[in-house]
Amino acid sequence: MNNEMILVLDFGGQYNQLIARRVREANVYCEVIPYNASLERIKSYNAKGIIFTGGPNSVLDEGAPKCDPGVFELGIPVLGICYGMQLMSVMLGGSVTAANQREYGKVEICVDKSQPLFRDVDENTICWMSHTYYVDTPPKGFEVIAKSANCPTGAMQHVEKNLYAVQFHPEVMHTPKGKEMLKNFLYNICGCKGDWKMSSFVENSINAIREKVGDKKVLCALSGGVDSSVAAVLIHKAIGKQLTCIFVDHGLLRKYEGDQVEQIFRKQYDINLIRVNCEDRFLQRLKGVSDPETKRKIIGEEFIRVFEDEAKKIGKVDFLVQGTIYPDVIESGIGDAAVIKSHHNVGGLPEHVDFKEIIEPLRSLFKDEVRRAGEELGIPEDLVWRQPFPGPGLAIRVIGDLTKEKLDTLRDTDYIFREEIKAAGLDKEINQYFTVLTNMRSVGVMGDERTYDYALALRAVTTTDFMTADWARIPYDILEKVSTRIVNEVKQINRIVYDITSKPPATIEWE
């Protein structure tokens, strides 16, 4: 990839991936790497600029995360955010102290709008603070360019050394002018021109795939979800009939989804498609398993085993395609970062894979970028904007062990929920919505009889990047209609609850 590059050094804060997302929204490509990456590795990216993220640690703690000090001598512009600002100060001879009053939430700051970082930003502007410590004495040569009532060094800079830092979080939506500040860093300070465009990504990917694959055969894992569908069409554009797509119907799909996938890819696209119906195989392997991580690993392994079995039938296959995307990689752990949960595409692979290589053409893209790539490729809108669906399917939306009866129950409830959301015209406003079959039963009354059936959870969120998400404010009358239909039309359900937890602290999926 020959795009301009911004490097994001990850110090473990909760908003870190939003930084990468905001940079890309500004048409500049960036990658996230661990804070302790070697100087040689950092230099190898030939980056136009570097951003230090926030983090949960105090720079005053023993063993606090620190980057290679040589970063400050590269001459590359550096922007430190929150912890990144405090780290910059301490490593360059300044000092950090505990604040008399912790700042958390929206705070008004006063900025020096004559400085390049704050061009087109109001002198008094709102920003999002989340800190207990602050820089009380900036390093030699630095000047203060912003302050708040409780933070005398809200931002600082050393223009000659191209070093900049802010105590607040410009990447979050609660800092209204944050995007402008980041663009100022990218364009006014780093000199970026903005060459990260989806059309060039698609074109470059097609060329790279052709060069990599040559005349060899490729097998694609197709689920019918957005990620694997875009990956399949992208690969097909590059190599045509050398691609064979295997659609594994593991019995964990949504209602009618298996037939819809076959209809679209076999008839609408001239793609070699093999549908493998193996519901019994998966359910047998998952029998009695309730731990979500174990479910994911088993499903990932079975997927690969199925692919290997089919590959033997069709002859020599050199490459396996997967629809891994950037949030999959991030949430499965970057460097020393804690693993939130393994993702099917990256954590479910067994150690031995009987293929030459895994190809992950979407590995560097966020979800909305995948959709844009799909539109660029001419994929129909109803497929590009299909609801996100995890690789393990409904297995991680049934809490506890799996049975066919539970899956069928969940399928019916999910279908009703999606049908009513679409009928209400909310399907484009809510980014992801689904039902979860809990492993809890509750007492109810239907007619004159006592019932003791499952409690069902509704989950719906709004998000721009799926790294953070807010629970969707669905109107009460819609929720009432969904609840009434489900308890009347689906056996085994007598109670509906609505999940009003954001991400973080929760993940979007329950497992």
Swiss-Prot record:
Source taxon at top rank: Bacteria
The enzyme's E.C. designation: 6.3.5.2
One matching Pfam family: GATase
InterPro entries: Class_I_gatase-like (IPR029062), GATASE (IPR017926), GMP_synth_C (IPR001674), GMP_synth_GATase (IPR004739), GMP_synthase (IPR022955), GMPS_ATP_PPase_dom (IPR025777), NAD/GMP_synthase (IPR022310), Rossmann-like_a/b/a_fold (IPR014729)
Pathway linked to the protein: Purine metabolism; GMP biosynthesis; GMP from XMP (L-Gln route): step 1/1
Catalysed reaction, written as an equation: XMP + L-glutamine + ATP + H2O = GMP + L-glutamate + AMP + diphosphate + 2 H(+)
Enzyme class, spelled out: ligase
Domain GMPS ATP-PPase: 196-386
Domain Glutamine amidotransferase type-1: 5-195
Gene Ontology cellular-component terms listed: cytosol
Single GO MF annotation: GMP synthase activity
HAMAP family hit by this protein: GMP_synthase
Protein name: GMP synthase [glutamine-hydrolyzing]
Gene (name only): guaA
